[in-house]
Amino acid sequence: MDDPDCDSTWEEESEEDGEDGQADDTTDEDTGDDDGDAEEARPSLFQSRMTGYRNWRAMQDMQRYRHNYPDLTDQDCNGDMCNLSFYKNEICFQPNGALIEDILQNWKDNYDLLEENHSYIQWLFPLREPGVNWHAKPLTLKEVEAFKSSKEVRERLVRAYELMLGFYGFHLEDRGTGAVCRAQNFQPRFHNLNSHSHNNLRITRILKSLGELGLEHYQAPLVRFFLEETLVQHKLPSVRQSALDYFLFAVRCRHQRRELVYFAWEHFKPRREFVWGPRDKLRRFKPQTIPQPLTGPGQADKDEGSRDPSQEAGTQGRTCGSGRDLSGDSGTAEDPSLLNTKPSDGGTLDGNQRDEAKSLSPKESKKRKLEGNRQEQVPGEADPQGVSEVEKIALNLEECALSPISQEPREAEPPCPVARVANEVRKRRKVEEGAEGDGVVSNTQMQASALPPTPSECPEAQKDGNGPEDSNSQVGAEDSKSQVGPEDPNSQVGLEDPNSQVGPEDPNSQVGPEDPNSQVGPEDPNSQVGPEDPNSQVVGPEQAASKSPVEDPDSDTMGTSVDESEELARIEASAEPPKP
């Protein structure tokens, strides 16, 4: 470095401030570095001033500030403390100013006014040295003590700091630590900061005033933020030189300043041109409490931690805090779908299954089985069955479960096949009587009515029975010995018994008109098929003279016998006929 007496950053702890440069010179001579490296680390005064790598004037200015202006003495101002009165909201800043509360409340988003007005900054952040605004009085030591002891004044000072951070596109993340991050509108504000270089002087004043008025812990986070935005993110190229010459050395804490210089040396390109610290000491330096960047406003954790600065270079919303690890959210909501995979839940589930196995419904049992299987599932694996599928399976199980208590009463069973045959015989006879008019029943119709029901009409053999309109359907083809009535064995109607068939094949089964005894009229009450239906008589009295074929009385299988009629009447009374 060109003048070691102007930088006490790397002096030994036991040395005095006036002997700062001797340690650097001695150490550099003792080290075995090459001559080229030594020349790069300590360029000549002429080279520094010509190339601008290290500003000698900035070194003197910051050294003077860090040592509390040893050449200054407080002037007698007759007890006037203008800076304190301004912060107590008693006077307006000069010239043509306003009260501090008016500035803090109404100037917050008025970026044009904050940019164009050059008189308020000396009042908001006073220093012990005079500035360009001669109306602003230098800060006195009495005022410094009053600033530190007044809670109201310190609160307004923090609000003024937040006002200027917002103007530059920053956000104060934590008032306690001074952590800084990007604001939501940082892009246009960064553009304004790159376009107006006079803001670099304002930032230097802000850093100095924070150190004077008791907010030294705000210095290092802000400087770290600028170093990262200039050297790592390259978003503020116009601020880079001021950050290295002024901002970096405004930090009064020597240890924090060393950490910041080391961070700047790590990210400076090309490193051989870095002249803001001795290279040999930077190589041996081990950072311990480098301020850590934050992720952004509203997205930072408040726990302390340590991270490697090189790993944080690529993060987007950068902030600076002192030894803070705010890389993520403090809490993460657990996935509701994984709540059932905990071991404690699994043990409770097994106990409930053993205790309540008998009282569970099929739906609940299926749900618990699926939950048990889900416990064995890999956390990263997708659930094979969703909630909707589980509900469907449970509903299907409920429908298939046979429980006499929970099931509703079923509909009435279909009538017996024998009763259905008798009912069909009655209906066919009524239709035939109305259609022919003479009451003659053909042999084929008699045969069809006497045939047993087909398997399609039996509900035990087949569910969907045919309607009574099919006159050719046979009932009981599989059982040739189906009985019409269990009491009368002679009433069996089957295909195996040729005598039971009534058709043209058996001439004896046909009864002609020559046999008057074959007439079945109302005089014989036993010949009625059903007592409820008087129209079910086979032949009326007016048809006695007609030549209608009547069954031979010798045939023991005719349905008009007394036993058969009684049996049919009994069956019909027990079973309701279906609606037509």
From Swiss-Prot:
The modification Phosphoserine is found at residues 327, 361, 365, 403, 548, 555. It is found in: Cytoplasm, Perinuclear region; Nucleus. GO terms for cellular component: membrane; nucleus; perinuclear region of cytoplasm. The modification N-acetylmethionine is found at residue 1. It comes from the Eukaryota. GO terms for molecular function: opioid growth factor receptor activity. This is Opioid growth factor receptor. It comes from Rattus norvegicus (Rat).
